[in-house]
Amino acid sequence: MVKLRLKRCGRKQQAIYRIVAIDVRSRREGRDLRKVGFYDPIKNQTCLNVPAILYFLEKGAQPTRTVYDILRKAEFFKDKERTLS
């Protein structure tokens, strides 16, 4: 199963996160299938590759709670109301 989740990058005390599609059995820093964006909580910046995210969601990838919140804040789910289990 594939998940969209955060992968930590950056320096100590200055973390930035890549949003990646990754196999659920992989470590947080493990090899990802594809990078689909990044999130910088310090500068509050987000960059999303929308076609890639749509591709993985259509194939059945599940976003983690944090990635779902980032996508919702970026108004990725405009009309669709989605619940996570």
UniProtKB/Swiss-Prot annotation:
Its main location: plastid. One of its GO terms (biological process) is mitochondrial translation. It holds the Pfam family Ribosomal_S16. It comes from the Eukaryota. InterPro entries: Ribosomal_bS16 (IPR000307), Ribosomal_bS16_CS (IPR020592), Ribosomal_bS16_dom_sf (IPR023803). Signal peptide: none annotated. Disulfide bonds: none annotated. HAMAP family: Ribosomal_bS16 (MF_00385). This is Small ribosomal subunit protein bS16c. The lineage of its organism: Eukaryota, Viridiplantae, Streptophyta, Embryophyta, Tracheophyta.
